[in-house]
Amino acid sequence: MDKKALKRLEYHKVLEQLAACSGSSLGREKIMAMEPLDNLQAILRKQEETSEGRKLLRLEPFAEAGGWKDIRAQLRKAGQGAILDPEELLAVADTLTAGRTIRKFFQDRQEQYPLLYEVSSALVSLPELERKIKNAILPGGEVADGASPELAQIRRRLAAAQAQVKEHLEHIIRSPSYQKYLQEPIVTIREGRYVVPVKIEHRSQVPGIVHDQSASGATLFIEPMAVVEKNNELRRLMAAEKREIQRILAELSAGVAQHAGPIGASLEALGELDFIMARARYSQKLDAWAPLLEGEACMDIRRGRHPLLQGEVVPIDIRLGADFDTLVITGPNTGGKTVALKTAGLLVLMAQSGLHIPAGEGSRLGIFRQVFADIGDEQSIEQSLSTFSSHMNNIVEIIGKAGPDSLVLLDELGAGTDPAEGAALAQSILEKLHSAGAKTVATTHYGELKDFALTRERVENASVEFDAITLRPTYRLLIGKPGRSNAFEIAARLGLPEEVVKRARSFLTAEHIQAEELMRSLEKTQQEAEAERRRAAELASEARALKERYEKIEADLASKRESILSKAAEEAQALVRAARLEAEAAVRELREKMAEEAARERENAIREAREKLRKLQQRVGRAVPEKTVPGEAPAGLRPGEEVFLTRYNQKGYVLEPPGAGGEVLVQVGVIKMNVPLRELRRVKEARPAGGQSEVAGVLLNKAREISPELDLRGLYADEALLEVEKYLDDAYLAGLSRVYLIHGKGTGSLRAAIHRQLSGHRRVKSFRLGEHGEGGLGVTVVELA
C-alpha cells in the first residue's frame, strides 16, 4: 500500500486511536505495525475476529483478558542462561496463570467464539512451573521461606542468631555502667553488623570494632567485642541464605528457559487476542459495523462518517465501481468536498485492515490493491516547488502506478495554475486514469469538468449540498448532481461588502449569469423537493408508527378480551365444579345415611338370626341324645386347645378352662357355648363316625356360600359401599378371617371410598393393599375382627 497515501489520509491517527484501546505493549506494537491487506480471505478473517470480539464485549462485558505481562525480555534473558530476579519470575508466573485462565474461558465457549478459541489454543499450560514459581516467590517479590527446606532451616537459624545478638546488645545498652558512654540507648546496623552508638570521647571504655562515624563526628558506631563472633555467625548465615536464594532462582530460571519456546508462542497469542479486542473496543467506540466485502474493486458506503472528526458529523453516501468508475465532486470551499474524499479513502483502508467502519449496515466495499491520494498543499520550500508542481509530482507518480484495482483520490485537481489550462489538464488526467481502469474520486472548482462528466461513459458528477435559503453548506454529498461554487454567497456571508459582490457579478457574462441562475433555481427546486420528500417520508413513517400503534392496541384489546372471556369461562367452570362437589357431598351424605340405616337393619337381622341360631342350638341340644364315645373326658384343658364335641360331632377351641360347674367355654365357628367336660375329647383321640348336626350344617353351608373375594369392578362408589357392607357381615357370619375386595386400579377413587368405609369398621381388624401375586393396587386385603 502506498505509504504517502496512508499519511495523507491520516491512517496513522486511526492507529493512534486504536492503540489507546489496547491493554498491552505487545498489542500496541501490533497495532502500530498494522497495514491494510489486499487479500480478500485474510481481510474477511480479520473482520470476523473483530466481530467476535465485539460480540464478546456485548455478551460478556466483564470478561477479563488481562493480568499478563510482556515477558519477552525475561524469556530472552533466561534463554541466555541468566538468572531472573524474583519480580521477573513472578511476571512469568502471572502470564502463565492469565494464559491458562483465558484458554479455559474460550475452551468453554468455542462454539460462540471459534476464531478467538483458535487463537487461544496456542496458549500454553505449564501448571507445575507456575506452581513452583508462586510457591517460591511471594507477591511482593520476596523469596518465601518454603521455597526450599534448606532456606527455611537457614532462616530459622538466622532469626535465632539475630535474636541472640539483639538480646546481648539490649543488655549492654540497658546496663547503667554503659549508658553514660552511649549517645543513645539503641541498637542499629552498620555494614550488615549490629552496633551501638558510642560517644567519641568514651571510645576506650567500649572495646570493639568501629564500623562507622556520624556526620558530626561525635558518634562512633561500635560493634562490642562480646558480639563479634555472633555477628560473624550472622554474616555466615546471611551468605548461606543468599546462596540458597540464588540456587532457587537459578533452578526456576532454568525451568523458564526450558519452556521458553512454548511460553513465547503463548505470549504471541496473548498479544494477538489483545490486538483483536482493541479492534472490537474501537468498533464499539465508533458505533461501527463490519462492511460487506467482495472481490471487485468498488464501494457503496451508506451514511459513512469520518472517524477522526469530533462532535456531530454529517454522514455521507458515496458509491463507485458499479455504475461509474470516476466521480467528479464540485461545490464551494468549506462545503465538505475534501472530507468526503478522505472519508471514502480512510474507510477503505480501515476495512482492509480488519477494522469495522463507522457507516450504516449494508455498506459494501471491494478490495483495492492500491490506494493513491493527492490531498492538500504539500509544497516543499527545500525543493522550491510551487503548489502546482507539488501536485503534478504526485499525479505523475500515481499515473505510473494506478491500475484496475486502484483507488485514486485527487483533491482540487488542476488547481494552482491558469484556470483554462488547469481545467484542460484535469480532464486529460481523468481520462488517463479512466482508461487505465482506476476507480477515481476527484474534487474540483472547474465547471468544465462538470461537462466532462456529462459527456463520458462511466463518469458521474456529484456535489456537496449548499442550502440556498440559509446560504450555508449542509455537507451532504449528492451523486448525479453537479455543484456550484457559490463564491458570491459565501463571500457575502463572510462579510465582503455588498457593493463589491454586486460589482463582481457585473463582470460575469450574461450566459454565465443565466446558467448560474438556472442552476440556482434548479438547486432550490431540488432542495424544496427533497425537503418535501423528507417530509413525506417522515409523515409516512409517522403513519406507519400510528398504524403499528393502533394495530398493537387492537391486538392488546383482543388479547384482553380473550383473557376476560377465558377468565369468565374458568370462573364459570369453577362454579360448576363447586356445585358438582356440593351435590356429590350431599349425595354422599344421603348414601351414608342410607347405608347406616341399612346397616342397622342388617344388624337387627343378624341379631335375630343369632337368636334363632341360639334357640335352634338349644333345641338341637335337647334333641340330640348323648352319645357314648370311647375315651375319657380330657383333663387339664388349656385355652386354645382343639377339642372334639361328641354331642355335635364338631371340632372347636377351648376359650376358658373348666369352671366350677364342670363346663368348658368352647368356640365352634362363630358360636361360643358352654359344654360339659364329659362331652369333650381331645382331637387326637378317636371319634365316632356319623352325620353333621343341624347347627354345624347351617354354619358349613354358610361358609360354602360366601366367597373370600368380592369383585366390585364396574360399580359406582355408593353401590360398591352397600355391597361391601353386606359382604362383611356375611363373611363374618361365615367365619372367614380374611377377605379380598377387588376394586381395580383405575383412577383410585373407588379404592379411596372403600378404604374410608373400612377405617374404623366394627367387622374390620385391619386392611392393606394387595401384594405381588394378590392383585397389587387393584385389591384390598381385609383381616376380619
Curated annotation (Swiss-Prot):
Residues at which ATP binds: G331, P332, N333, T334, G335, G336, K337, T338
EC number of this enzyme: 3.1.-.-, 3.6.4.-
KW Chaperone (keyword) present: no
Residue ranges of domain Smr in the record: 710-785
Protein's UniProt keywords contain Cytoplasm: no
GO biological process: mismatch repair; negative regulation of DNA recombination; rescue of stalled ribosome
GO MF annotation list: ATP binding; ATP hydrolysis activity; ATP-dependent DNA damage sensor activity; endonuclease activity; mismatched DNA binding; ribosomal large subunit binding; rRNA binding
Protein purpose: Endonuclease that is involved in the suppression of homologous recombination and thus may have a key role in the control of bacterial genetic diversity.
Similarity comment: family membership: Belongs to the DNA mismatch repair MutS family. MutS2 subfamily.
Protein name listed in UniProt: Endonuclease MutS2
Organism this protein belongs to: Pelotomaculum thermopropionicum (strain DSM 13744 / JCM 10971 / SI)
Organism placement in taxonomy: Bacteria, Bacillati, Bacillota, Clostridia, Eubacteriales
